Amino acid sequence: MTLPSIAIIGRPNVGKSTLVNRLCQSNDAIVFDKPGVTRDRTYQNASWGGKEFQVVDTGGLVFEDDSEFLPEIRTQVFLALEEASIALFVVDGNQGVTTGDLSIAKWLRNSDCKTIVAVNKCESLSLGISMASEFWKLGLGEPYPVSAIHGSGTGDLLDLVIDELPKDFDVEDKEDKVMMSIIGRPNVGKSSLLNAICGEKRAIVSDISGTTTDSIDTLIKKNSHLWKIVDTAGIRRKKNVKYGTEFFGINRAFKSIDRSDVCVLVIDAIDGVTDQDQKLAGRIEEQGRACVIVVNKWDLVEKNNSTIYQVEKELRSKLYFLHWSKMIFISALTGQRVENIFEHALNAVTQHRMRVTTSVVNEVLKEALGWKSPPTKRSGKQGRLYYGTQVKNQPPTFTLFVNDPKLFGITYRRYIEKQIRLNLGFEGSPIILLWRGKQKRDLEKETSKKNINIIQKD
């Protein structure tokens, strides 16, 4: 179950980390009387009134200065707000309303996140109410006086937070859905593809790059499965992206990749694979997501009997990160082969979730060793592959126990991966091979305990 999160936001040195420690009843957040101590966003679990949630501590937010780490801190704060259910805007009651507070308030008013203003450093109850009243001018509703250091007012603040948390935040996680994200550069036809999949105009489509600025979620039933399809904002080069709706949309797109069961990477058949396409492919591979490569606008390509083979060869040479992905050629405009996406996506998800018994893994490894022995170094020392086992899925991950991982070069490692794929499948899914050195004495104890036969002995 994913817990709702509360983002703690404010200028440097207003007491955000102290308030985090108070709300979470911990001392995990570093507190020091100097601006800029917190840079990255950090997460802590908390509970109040029988409800659990996450508290996200962020660095001091400054819009008027780009020195040192301030731009990076801004990015972290923006990310925290994007995933938050509530923003807790912390201000300094002793200093009153500053220009920095006004800048942050303006930004928060333009966001979709519910915001609560916490006026910190109100150590005196009677003075606190007076100090807090000044912050009505921020335009974010009633300000609440608190003292993070003494704890006064924090209970009332938590009561308010609990009342504002979504009541059904965990419903989605209880439903059995396949989450499929449509990923790609701007204007490759992602929204057209979503419309073709849904059979209706679900997303705005135009020739203007960047029409979709946010992730659009759609639930549909296909082949007895419930699919949650996410049409993401087009992802451009980082240097071309400014803060605002596009920034938030792109970060949602990256989060969609990370949370997806399967990604549909859309490539423009006319433009081919660009540098940005390669970066997206790398992100999918890095996150270990299942993937289907969809080449859109195939109806616009002049072709003969061999065109599809030539184009696929060229595209795969540039998308080598995803050599294991199925590639299909479609037209979102005409609907050509769009229905095939579900078949291949479901197969990729199934392969991504698959588990293989240790005995079957070792049968495959034994056969692979029979065809090609591990290499021998100039020193005369030869690699020994003792046994392997699958340790997890999503993505499928195998640990291979050997005498010395350094004796197994990249060529032989690729050979073993190829043999696993040839015998066990995993089309549409990455697999991870972890090569672990094992002492002979420890090996014998472990294999006898688990009743595993050693494939290759010293």
From Swiss-Prot:
Domain KH-like: 354-439
Entry-linked Pfam families: KH_dom-like (PF14714), MMR_HSR1 (PF01926)
Transmembrane segments: none
Keyword Manganese assigned: no
Listed InterPro entries: G_ENGA (IPR031166), GTP-bd (IPR006073), GTPase_Der (IPR016484), KH_dom-like (IPR032859), KH_dom-like_a/b (IPR015946), P-loop_NTPase (IPR027417), Small_GTP-bd (IPR005225)
Gene3D superfamilies: 3.30.300.20, P-loop containing nucleotide triphosphate hydrolases (3.40.50.300)
Keyword GTP-binding attributed: yes
GO molecular function: GTP binding; ribosome binding
GO process terms (BP): ribosome biogenesis
Subunit structure of this chain's protein: Associates with the 50S ribosomal subunit.
Function: GTPase that plays an essential role in the late steps of ribosome biogenesis.
Similarity comment: Belongs to the TRAFAC class TrmE-Era-EngA-EngB-Septin-like GTPase superfamily. EngA (Der) GTPase family.
Name of the molecule in the record: GTPase Der
Organism: Prochlorococcus marinus (strain MIT 9515)
Organism classification: Bacteria, Bacillati, Cyanobacteriota, Cyanophyceae, Synechococcales
